Design a protein with these regions (language model features):
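AAA+ P-loop NTPase catalytic core and its hallmark functional loops
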Residues: 41-207
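Charged low-complexity interaction tracts in eukaryotic proteins
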Residues: 3-40
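Alpha-helix N-cap/helix-initiation sites
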Residues: 2, 6, 153-156
């Protein structure tokens, strides 16, 4: 009981006062030299070259406005095209097979209400401890002169307004890295939708 007397407990607590930021550590010369070594993050892995030409499907049967789509792609002219029609009637598949038959690269982007500039144009990504700029699918298509397919574009929000200059054939300025990307020869944009929206009726309607 005597060990639990008030004065005894108070004395013991006084002996074990906690100091702020105080550590009793032994630092050797080797430790100091090790701490002084400058850490250099490894470089980001280079992008892997990919073949983006779709595979031909032997079961595909040409129908509807497939001939018009194929001619537009074959011309290699910038002629952005909006294709509408019921869900599942071959809008996307026809663009893919036209590219497959013509040996043209295709980059497909599935659009949702959450799709934003970072998803489309690109942004910084964390790679091995460093922030590295990664091109989005739109910039990739611009640089490669590929066909860009924006699937289900009628589901998009106003976040895709970043595509306005690209749809005018003027390329895009990447403000985050101060670089301008102009469309390479052959670049074109196709967009598909299940509805015609409230814009122009000048579209390819898929029956």
């Amino acid at each position: 009981m005597n060990d639990c007397a008030y004065q005894t407990v108070t004395n013991k607590l006084t002996d074990y006062k906690v100091g702020r930021g105080k550590w009793n550590l032994e630092v050797t010369k080797e430790t100091v030299q090790e701490l002084e070594v400058t850490y250099s993050a490894p470089a980001a892995m280079p992008a892997i070259e990919q073949n983006l030409i779709p595979k031909k499907d032997d079961t595909f049967v040409q129908f509807g406005n497939f001939g018009s789509i194929k001619k537009i792609i074959q011309s290699r002219l910038f002629y952005p095209t909006f294709i509408t029609g019921l869900s599942g009637n071959g809008k996307t598949f026809s663009v893919e097979q036209a590219c497959a038959q013509l040996g043209r690269e295709l980059i497909r982007v599935n659009i949702t209400i959450e799709t934003d500039e970072d998803d489309l144009i690109g942004g910084f990504r964390l790679v091995d401890g460093s922030t590295v700029w990664h091109n989005g699918p739109v910039v990739e298509a611009l640089e490669r002169g590929a066909i860009l397919l924006l699937d289900e574009i009628d589901l998009a929000s106003n976040k895709i307004l970043c595509l306005q200059s690209i749809l005018e054939g003027k390329g895009v300025f990447l403000k985050k890295i101060g670089k301008r990307v102009d469309p390479a020869s052959g670049f074109n944009v196709f967009a598909t939708a299940n509805t015609k929206g409230k814009g122009s009726d000048d579209t390819i309607h898929w029956n």
